[in-house]
Amino acid sequence: FLAKKVAKTVAKQAAKQGAKYVVNKQME
C-alpha cells in the first residue's frame, strides 16, 4: 500500500534529520 511506503520514506528522512541534529549538538 502506498501510504506505508510514504511513511517509511518519511521515517527515513526523520532519522536522517535526527542524526544531523545529534551531530550538531555534539559539535557544540
Swiss-Prot record:
What is the tissue localization of expression for this protein? Expressed by the venom gland.
Kindly list the places in or outside the cell where this protein is found, as annotated in its UniProt entry: Secreted
Positions carrying Glutamic acid 1-amide: 28
**GO MF annotations for this entry?**
toxin activity
Gene Ontology biological process terms in this record: defense response to bacterium
InterPro entries per UniProt: Cupiennin
Example of a GO cellular component annotation carried by this entry: extracellular region
A Pfam family that the UniProt record links to this protein: Cu
- Protein name, UniProt field: Short cationic peptide-1a
Show the taxonomic lineage: Eukaryota, Metazoa, Ecdysozoa, Arthropoda, Chelicerata
